[in-house]
A protein has these predicted regions:
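Selected transmembrane alpha-helices and immediately adjacent juxtamembrane segments
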Residues: 1-39, 124-175
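Residues within membrane-spanning alpha-helices of integral membrane proteins
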Residues: 3, 48, 103-107, 111, ...
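Alpha-helix N-cap/start motif
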Residues: 39-40, 70, 171, 201
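Selective hydrophobic functional segments
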Residues: 45-98, 102, 186-232, 236
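Transmembrane helix exit motif
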Residues: 57-67, 88, 104-129, 242-252
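Hydrophobic alpha-helical transmembrane segments in multi-pass integral membrane proteins
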Residues: 86, 143-151, 189-197, 204, ...
Length: 252
């Protein structure tokens, strides 16, 4: 029964992740509720072992239908991986609890900005080309990769917003690009969790399969309904992140 519950949660998480990120809002609470006595690191590692496959398949699906800026995306993904490793190291040196208190406020500002800019991310008009785009994308990958390793919640949303606001992408193309960087940051985290023995591999396969199925459904929905649909899901996910992080910070 436990495997069925977390596999269904993984499927739904894969669907949401494929559209705009935020699947951890679904899968992690399901894992913690189903296995309350497990070590948190093991549940985080098991979550990554499933979600990385859904994100990877979403990247492939998007690349078949959406132009992927590989020239800027590959360096961004590489630096995202390095940034995630650096962030994971930094969390062993500095207590990240101070950042937890600021996160709901940052997400709130991001949401307000998105809502007030009605046309934000509705049309695809990249602002930069060539080396300039490569450097800005690399900076996005490094900074948000570090954040993912150091703290984590909302990484997908921050990536999408950065591509929309800084590079001029629409929400669909931004989500597609964000997937590649997310695969890299997830790979870094999964490597660390694996080396520390914090992955339940007997759970990983069925959860990964379910996540991939959800990912394929989510990608189809995003491609079918376009940037406006992805924008609406983005707003919903950010609002859910605000509620979750505010509760964890101030009420729990």
């Amino acid at each position: 029964m436990e495997l069925l519950i977390v596999s269904l949660a993984s499927l739904l998480a894969g669907l949401v992740d494929a559209i705009v990120g935020g699947g951890g809002l679904i899968l992690l609470p399901a894992l913690f509720a189903t296995f309350p006595g497990a070590a948190p690191a093991t549940l985080f590692g098991t979550n990554k072992s499933a979600s990385i496959w859904g994100t990877a398949f979403a990247t492939v699906q998007y690349s078949r239908q959406v132009h992927m800026p590989w020239r800027s995306l590959l360096p961004a993904a590489g630096l995202g991986l390095l940034g995630s490793l650096a962030g994971a190291w930094a969390v062993t040196q500095v207590d990240p609890s101070w950042f937890r208190k600021a996160l709901p406020v940052l997400l709130g500002l991001l949401l307000i900005y998105t809502l007030t800019k009605k046309d934000l991310g509705r049309s695809h008009a990249p602002r930069f080309a060539g080396a300039t785009e490569v450097w800005i994308a690399a900076g996005i990958g490094l900074v948000i990769g570090f954040y993912d390793g150091f703290f984590g919640p909302g990484t997908g949303s921050f990536l999408v917003f950065a591509y929309v606001r800084l590079l001029g992408y629409d929400f669909l193309n931004a989500s597609a690009a964000a997937k590649m960087i997310n695969v890299a940051t997830n790979l870094a985290a999964l490597t660390l969790f694996t080396l520390k023995g914090h992955v339940w591999w007997h759970m990983a396969l069925p959860m990964a399969l379910a996540n991939v199925v959800g990912s394929l459904i989510g990608t189809r929905l995003a491609l079918k309904h376009g940037a406006g649909f992805v924008r609406h899901v983005f707003i919903f996910v950010v609002l859910a992140l605000i509620c979750k992080t505010a509760y964890d910070t101030w009420l729990r």
